[in-house]
Amino acid sequence: MAPRGLPGSAVLAAAVFVGGAVSSPLVRSDHSGSHPLPSKTETTPSPTNNNGNGHPEYIAYALVPVFFVMGLFGVLICHLLKKKGYRCTTEAEQDVEGEKVEKIELNDSVNENSDTVGQIVQYIMKNEANVDILAAMVEDNNVCDPESPVTPSTPGSPPVSPGPLSPGVTPGKHICGHHLHTVGGPVERDVCHRCRHKRWHFIKPTNKSKEGRPRRQGEVTVLSVGRFRVTKVEPKSNQKERRSLMSVSGTDSVNGEVPVTPVKRQQSDSE
């Protein structure tokens, strides 16, 4: 109920004002008027996954000095071993020139129209042992087996009658001794089918035997890992002492006396 001194409309207005003040946002009371206070909201950054977003350039900058230091460390180790009488070598150094010559000749003989059989034969012919075995098999088949196919280049083969020639072509002999013929038969012209289409590679006569690097006198292999090898060469003074001992022992054995060791000589000199 409303108080007695106040009218009902005044009480209703006061109630509406109080309810609006409670439900409205914060306002600043000022003589100029009421202005709403700005609300401050704080946003927390969401955690992002930085595992995949790294910096690979920093890793490269760190790896390059590491490899550089490792190379210098290896050179230092080889230098120290060389001072102590060891020798660090690789087996691939001796065959560098031979491999270059073989690659040049193979590149010259390779043709774009080479078939699969020619490539297989080329890979087989790279091994000298296969070449020798194949040559021996061809000789055995030509000499021992009377039913083996006879090629025009085989010694003792009957003359082959040339086939029909086109006008303007002079007949000639079949001269292709630079490769092996697997199938014998009449030849139409002065070249065979493979020579005409250039489907056969030249066979390189390999008579030389691969000889390893000649070892020095007194050279002993200490460590061998793959192609890396560490050898030790004895000083020349020890070799001269051994030679002198061998010469002395040889003269003593000729005279019929037992060779005396250096220890016994020192004992006899002290007595």
UniProtKB/Swiss-Prot annotation:
Annotated segments matching region Disordered: 27-52, 144-168, 231-271
Record's compositionally biased regions (Pro residues): 155-165
Membrane-topology descriptor: Single-pass type I membrane protein
Keyword Transmembrane helix recorded: yes
One Gene Ontology term from the biological process aspect of the record: positive regulation of p38MAPK cascade
Localisation: Cell membrane
Biased composition (Basic and acidic residues): 231-244
Composition skew (Low complexity), residue ranges: 36-52
Transmembrane regions listed in the UniProt entry: 58-78
Cytoplasmic compartment spans: 79-271
Keywords: Cell membrane, Membrane, Phosphoprotein, Signal, Transmembrane, Transmembrane helix
Keyword match Oxidoreductase: no
Pfam families hit by this protein: RELT
Subunit description: Interacts with RELT, RELL2, OXSR1 and PLSCR1.
Family: Belongs to the RELT family.
UniProt name for this protein: RELT-like protein 1
Gene: RELL1
